[in-house]
Every structure is written in structure tokens, then in C-alpha cells.
């Protein structure tokens, strides 16, 4: 079995990949995550997933490398990871009662081959009060998450609905697509 590397140090992605019961290592990719002028949220997610995988694959040319990225999209505007309580509050306020699209891309780069997939998840947030937003952020600061919430935790209480073909995509790694790509690359799953 060839070496498998996850180009991420995200605990969320590491936990998801662990579900496939494959041996893998993690390596932090060194990639500039800034959007390019005019780049759509889906194009940004796709480009970053490829760049993360390709950057690590250049260091480990005999390995298969998984790169993934997620970009939240509110009315065509990409929402980054908030980083601060204030920005998280502003994001949740803007998303209150709205449908937010999450573009989650995965790229598998290996010896002489690249495979890619893109998942779209739509999240309908319920109308949130200022008090609910503050209470949520105090209980579960999601400053490192696109959209300022953790759907695998208390953040699910902020939603009215989720529309997706892959429930794991919203956590940050579309496992249905990734399992398909890994099988195409010759990995035996299960």
C-alpha cells in the first residue's frame, strides 16, 4: 500500500479520514490562502485543495497526498475563518435567516496522477437573536471554522436545514467523494 498523507493539521479532517481505517500521516501545507481577484468561492476552494496537496506531494513524490479546503459563500461573497470573536459575531449576524453555501473541495495527488472532487452543501440558518449568537460563541468559539460554527457540535442548533449529498463535507472533508477518489487511485476501501 502506498504512503498516504493528509495535507492538513486540522483535527476535524484528521478524525474524518481516520474513519476509513487507512494508515496516514499529516503534514502542514504551506499555502497562501488569499483569494485572487474575481475568484469565485468554489474556484477558491478547488484551487486551495489542489495547492495544498501539490505542495506536500512535491516533498513526498512517492506518496498519495490529500488536500482539502472549504469556503463559505453568502450571496456570492466568500467568508473566511473569522479568527476573532467580533468577526464571528458579524458573520453569524449576516448569516442569520440566510442560506449559506459551503464549497468543500478535495484533491488527491499521487505519482503522475491528480484526482479532484467538489461538494456543495447548503445550510439554512434560522433567524438568530443577538443573545443567541453571543451565547453560542461563548459556549463554542468556532474561530477556526468557515462560517463561524461547528456543525458537529452545538452549532447544529443554529440551523433550520442542511442540503447535501455528503454530510461529512460540512465538517471539512467530503468523505464520500474522497473514498471514491482513493478507490480510483487503487486503495482498497473497505
Swiss-Prot record:
Its EC number is 3.6.1.-. GO terms for cellular component: cytoplasm. It is found in: Cytoplasm. GO terms for biological process: nucleotide metabolic process. Signal peptide: none annotated. One of its GO terms (molecular function) is nucleoside triphosphate diphosphatase activity. The record marks 12, 70, 152 as: Important for substrate specificity. Pfam families: Maf. Its main location: cytoplasm. The active site is at 69 (proton acceptor). InterPro entries: ITPase-like_fam, Maf-like. Its cofactor is a divalent metal cation. It catalyses: N(7)-methyl-GTP + H2O = N(7)-methyl-GMP + diphosphate + H(+). Nucleoside triphosphate pyrophosphatase that hydrolyzes 7-methyl-GTP (m(7)GTP). May have a dual role in cell division arrest and in preventing the incorporation of modified nucleotides into cellular nucleic acids. Belongs to the Maf family. YceF subfamily. This is 7-methyl-GTP pyrophosphatase. It comes from Xanthomonas axonopodis pv. citri (strain 306).
Amino acid at each position: 500500500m502506498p504512503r498516504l498523507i493528509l495535507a492538513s493539521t486540522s483535527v476535524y479532517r484528521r478524525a474524518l479520514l481516520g474513519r476509513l481505517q487507512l494508515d496516514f500521516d499529516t503534514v502542514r501545507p504551506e499555502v497562501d490562502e488569499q483569494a485572487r481577484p474575481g475568484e469565485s468561492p468554489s474556484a477558491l476552494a478547488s484551487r486551495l485543495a489542489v495547492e495544498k496537496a501539490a505542495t506536500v506531494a512535491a516533498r513526498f513524490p512517492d506518496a498519495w497526498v490529500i488536500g482539502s479546503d472549504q469556503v463559505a459563500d453568502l450571496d456570492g461573497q466568500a467568508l473566511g475563518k473569522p479568527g476573532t470573536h467580533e468577526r464571528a459575531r458579524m458573520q453569524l449576524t449576516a448569516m442569520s435567516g440566510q442560506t449559506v453555501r459551503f464549497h468543500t473541495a478535495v484533491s488527491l495527488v499521487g505519482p503522475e496522477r491528480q484526482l479532484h472532487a467538489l461538494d456543495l452543501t447548503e445550510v439554512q440558518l434560522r433567524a438568530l437573536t443577538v443573545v443567541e449568537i453571543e451565547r453560542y460563541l461563548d459556549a463554542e468559539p468556532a474561530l477556526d471554522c468557515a462560517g463561524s460554527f461547528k456543525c458537529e457540535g452545538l452549532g447544529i442548533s443554529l440551523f433550520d436545514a442542511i442540503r447535501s449529498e455528503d454530510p461529512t463535507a460540512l465538517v471539512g472533508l467530503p468523505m464520500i467523494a474522497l473514498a471514491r477518489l482513493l478507490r480510483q487511485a487503487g486503495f482498497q476501501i473497505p
